Amino acid sequence: MLDGVSIAWKDLFDIEGRITTAGSVVLKSNPPAKNDAALVDAGKRAGMVAIAALSMNEFAYSGIGINPHYGTPRNPHDKKLHRSPGGSSSGSAVAVACGSLPVAIGTDTGGSIRLPAAFNGIVGYKSSTGHYDMSGVFPLSRTLDSLGPLAQTVEDCVMVGRVLRGLNTSITKRDIKGMEFIVPTNIMFDGIEDAVQENFEAALKRITKAGVRIKRKTFPVFEKFFELLKTRGNVLGPEALQLHWNRVHGPDAERMDPRVVKRIKMAENMSAVDFVEVLLQRQALIAECNDEIKTAIVICPTTPHVAMDIKPLEDDMDLFFATNAKTLRNTMIGNFFDWCGLAIPSGTNEDDMPTSVLLSAPHGQDTKVLSSGLSLESIIRQNANL
């Protein structure tokens, strides 16, 4: 079915005979991989042609896409400004958006598939954790890491995802009239750009007209999540710090992106008690959130703004961190609550920069999200010109 189809992999996936750099110069002297990552091997066995390892943020630790070592891919939707390609699967999204590849595979720990897809006007699917075999993939957070395809259409994501999992069964469209969606009314729309809001509301009207039942609902559990972040910390930080401890406390730190070093070291302020408390409270909050969602799908803007000019972010570290946090806000909610998610283009703003809609559901409901996306993609993308 996919024999001869080109595919490329974010530079976290081991490709036999090639050094996996994870976007960092500090790994350039590592020995080449002796074996393919599990998914790379699955793609090859299906006849897919692995043609490249793709650019990314150093160690996958940002939603902006900046890489001072190997260069930051240009967002193809602006020929003048060097806008953010999104991160951390920046090269994966740009390669697909430019038409260089039909599909690329990325990873997502806080939004790193869905954000680049949104900024570049393509489809990005973040699977549930454990949905794909992670063997041979350089980690960031063993609790939160997940994988998924970036492609031009939902159908392409479904097709490639099925092959990489070695499945014979297919995912088909859901009956639109049986769908129930929830729009969160808190957190996710704070500071949203006008065009993102307008395109989102227009997409809601179209899918409502098609038969989807829409309910708007406040999620107090979101407020609890952000309060937990403020008072205790997050899951990702300590896991990244443990992984990179020797790098950020040794000579390698001077060769790393200072933004990445600073972000990793932020977790030093968390105690072991804080980390355990976050893990325990996370499970309770996931259960509470799932009870709020029940059988519905959560729909929201993938990110509150379109891709931004990267120059000010390169020059001002404080601005970089503030922008990164806002960019990741909506998607990282999904990672914390262990959702799967599908980003679909919803239109453009006055500068022809893409906006995006995100469909999400609790862990293990990947088929529901993808089948809903198959049914609704053409309606959501109507007049998107992407």
Positions of the model-derived regions?
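Short, well-ordered beta-strand elements within core beta-sheets of diverse protein domains
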Residues: A8, L27-P31, D145-Q152, K265-M270, ...
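Short glycine-rich anion-binding loops that position phosphate/pyrophosphate groups of nucleotides
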Residues: L12, I187, T303-V306
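Structural helix-boundary/capping segments
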Residues: R45, C98-D190, E201-A210, V276, ...
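Serine-dependent amide/ester hydrolase catalytic core
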Residues: L243-F336
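Short helix-loop capping/hinge segments that flank enzyme active sites or metal/cofactor-binding pockets
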Residues: L2-V25, H82, I176-G178, N234-I286, ...
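Glycine/threonine-rich flexible loop motifs
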Residues: T20-S29, E193-D194, M308-D316
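Flexible, acidic loop-helix segments that line cofactor/substrate-binding pockets
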Residues: G178-I187, K217-R232, D257-N269
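Gly/Ser-rich catalytic/binding loops embedded in alpha/beta enzyme cores
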Residues: M1-T109, K205, A210-G211, N290
